[in-house]
Amino acid sequence: MVKLASQSGASAIKFQMHVLDDEMLRKTPKSKNFSESLYDALNRTNLSIKQHIYLKKYCKQNNIDYLCTPFSRKSADILFNEVKVNIFKIGSGELTNLPLQIHIAKKKLPTIISTGMSTFREVKETFDQVYKINKKIALTQCTSIYPCPSKYSDIGVIKDYIKKFKIPIGLSDHTNSIYTSLGAIALGACIIEKHFTLNKKAKGPDHASSIEPAELKQLVE
């Protein structure tokens, strides 16, 4: 998938790092679309530190940047100190997690912050706290529905973010096509994040909200 993403023209590919006991309880309630608890699902699919280091090296060999989302201060430290990540991506669920946001900001790396499930006041509060520590940040508009109908993407917010924050603004797009992303670019978005799969019909929680290699290539072109 790394090679295909690179061949399709993507600038970067993003992974996740979980240190489960540092970020959630073992008895986290089970989601309706999961057959197991979130803890068990992530424990089964989680990548090791060695795998992350290998993936970063493999990305470099294939001319695509390695990005990663930490979900706790410990995973952020591992990414910074051991994996040697060059950029952080913080997911929407951690937007109001100011201890984590500030901890990452102090590392002074370029950081992309998603803003799903949040009010404008919450976005501004996090921006104010982070920007005074690290000015190398970007925000992405996001609607946390998987897959997300285009009518709920609210890409008009992109223009508001550009006007208010005067930093790079993008879209974390969970629709199952490329057209919402194209609209976001027309509104000034300079970052587009899409879930990526080899088969939209595959089993799993994310495939239906993803695009395949041919679509990614079309989006980039």
Question: Which residues fall in each region the model found?
Answer:
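Catalytic cores and adjacent flexible loops of soluble metabolic enzymes
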Residues: 1-221
